[in-house]
A protein has these predicted regions:
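C-terminal compact regulatory domains
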Residues: 1-164
Length: 164
């Protein structure tokens, strides 16, 4: 039933293909136990980012927009979160406004918690706006797992937490 096609492709299979780059085991283990507030309005991006972070041993709290991020941070005890990964473009309140709101809070960790801008906008002006809003680091989308884990490590060092 149907037609069968046979084709011959003129190439050889490499017996020693290059290994795909991934997070080094010691790198992944080094963020174990880190408490991260992940702020993302896109369900697939949230799922992928959470999978990467939890796979490396981090404890992830979710917020789906800037307003929820501000609420989650303000209702938490100071020092609860080691890092905030903040999408820049979201409904209700964008990541820049959420960051400015968090930075203006009267609590000891509001000015010091590392906040990472996550965005597909990679122009220098976008990075500058993120820094002006109070974000410390910049992570391009689509997210690369190794880069994400390295960025969280940088956050932990910035926040005074030693990597495990």
């Amino acid at each position: 039933v149907g037609t069968t096609f046979y084709i011959t492709l003129p190439f050889r299979v490499d017996p020693n293909p290059p290994k795909a780059e991934s997070a080094k085991p010691e790198q992944a283990a080094s963020i174990k136990g880190a408490h991260i507030l992940l702020v993302e309005d896109n369900e697939l991006n949230m799922e992928i980012s959470q999978y990467i972070l939890e796979g490396a041993g981090a404890i992830v709290a979710q917020a789906w927009n800037g307003q929820e991020a501000v609420r989650r941070f303000s209702e938490s005890e100071p020092g609860t979160f080691d890092c905030i990964l903040m999408d820049v473009m979201m409904p209700l309140m964008d990541g820049l406004e959420a960051t400015r709101t968090i930075r203006a809070m009267q609590r000891p960790d509001a000015a010091t918690i590392p906040i990472v801008a996550m965005t597909a906008n990679t122009f220098s002006e976008d990075e500058q706006r993120s820094r002006e809003a109070g974000m410390n680091l910049f992570l391009n989308k689509p997210v690369d797992s190794g880069k994400m884990l390295q960025t969280v490590l940088e956050c932990l060092k910035m926040g005074g937490r030693n990597a495990l």
